[in-house]
């Protein structure tokens, strides 16, 4: 096997902290070529070299440029801010009140806010302007003949002012609330961002340099939280 074609380091995810727990070489992905001839060995090395090149290009495309490969806390500017799903609330209904209003031919149409204007009910003087009070009844807009009687309809159907549907619908009414975070989240990252940020690392000639230059993240017993290697000072 050519030493110039290393086996990639596979990152593991720490879900409680949202960090990478470390990386180790995945020897299970290596092809068995011990009984192969020189031609087969060359083809195997070609496949491994192509795989490493693809991983390097993928890391360059999806990884965020940062000084520290595996930071213990990600700033909010580099963390994917997921939008929470909207909250749906079932609106309460008073079936008994709806039936009573329908039977009595009640009409709901608009509303007014009571405002006082310095000891008088309106901003205009009652003597200068004659107010015309208009009273009316809602009508049902359908294919039936509109009744001109002043009393409630015999079928108890009434019109909600400003709406095209009469009476109360038996269907339930829901209120959808869009929830959003008031402050961007920082700290750990999610699984989707982890897959994009921590592509299997290709570390060339891992054992050819000084021991102090070897990345701590590639040591199996490395602790990403304390940034130390278990068993070493």
Swiss-Prot record:
Pfam families from the UniProt entry: Adeno_PVIII
Residue list for modification Phosphothreonine: 64
Induction info: Expressed in the late phase of the viral replicative cycle.
GO molecular function, one term: hexon binding
First and last residue of the signal peptide: none
This protein's record includes keyword Nucleotide-binding: no
UniProt cross-references to InterPro entries, sorted A to Z: Adeno_PVIII
UniProt keyword list: Capsid protein, Host nucleus, Late protein, Phosphoprotein, Virion
Positions of the propeptide removed during maturation: 112-163
Residues with site note (Cleavage): 111-112, 163-164
Modified residues (Phosphoserine): 180
Family in the record: Belongs to the adenoviridae hexon-linking protein family.
Official protein name in the record: Pre-hexon-linking protein VIII
Organism in which the protein naturally occurs: Human adenovirus F serotype 40
Record gene name: L4
